[in-house]
């Protein structure tokens, strides 16, 4: 029988983050995942400032991720065709990046191994039950496992929820549905810039192109399930989107798919979902921890993983009620507030006028562009004004993540510092900031 202080089920960002934090605090941690890494994961591959800061704190180095691409500017097109450039801050460090999950998650799991986590990838958990002051698991190819706590990072349809009998909404399908396809020979504006298109028929959803090294890009779109758009029509809608001139011109005439399109559901309901079942804490997609407005979830996954670890550390092995209380309070008190604000803003973006007004206001001048892009990329929490306990001194003007790594190279260009080509410079004319398409 395998014994541990904590067993983590799931090797994605939330599970690995929890495992790393626990191992560094001296806990004996085992991690199981049914997949063998590296493995692909359907995702937009974008990394917000908040996610980058957490990855840095947990020990992930960008140069360990082969497909890492620093982003220095974002372009947003409103339903009216107004396109605004939002340059990311030049205060040092990285504020946004793109990395394929097949590379990112494998590299992060290596960080967990280096921290002392015993990783069993390719081994599925087949049963789970709480027994007195332990949680008992049965794992394929490993056998029985017992731990004081379990961190469930096993995805939106968490099998552990079902095994423990705490499925709180049968038939749940998520708030978002997204489709992603990798493109190669991207030689247009999308080769270096990150693009978001708020086309009227997608609202409050959007289409995107996120740059990757070597003339490649993650291109896709996401829709809200509540918007009355049937998900079975997404592949046909995708073919139509790719023919739209304002998207085709950004990708470049030679851009072509290098892999099939893949679709996936996205959960975004952390404020109301069940976060704890006895000695089991749910994190990441299993906690439905995704931004309600954008569908982004990597930063939220890392945050829930760390919060779960800190709760276990603070509560100790014999006070599961305190662990549960601390974890729920921290999640609901911070991320719950972000979720409620994002849901409110999403209602504004459902309508063409609302989306058009949002882009107009955000791009009004240098000050609005500078502060909007920080907020958009989660340099600080969505609802930070309503949660003073999350304020920090340099919140509105501090540097990005990985500043020390950039300094060590002796260059101020983020992409070049990490071995990637720098983003193409934009002309210093009004058209570089705003242009109709």
Predicted regions and their residues:
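Beta1/beta-strand and adjacent pyrophosphate-binding region of the FAD-binding site
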Residues: 1-14
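Conserved Rossmann-like nucleotide-cofactor binding loop
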Residues: 14, 37, 157
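Glycine-rich FAD pyrophosphate-binding loop
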Residues: 23-43
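Conserved N-terminal glycine-rich FAD pyrophosphate-binding loop of Rossmann-like flavoproteins
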Residues: 36-56
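A conserved beta-strand/loop capping segment in the N-terminal third of enzymes
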Residues: 52-106
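FAD/FMN-dependent oxidoreductases across multiple families
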Residues: 67, 227-312
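Predominantly flavin-linked oxidoreductase catalytic cores and closely associated redox partners
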Residues: 111-251
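C-terminal helical "tail/cap" subdomain of flavin- and related membrane-associated enzymes
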Residues: 310-437
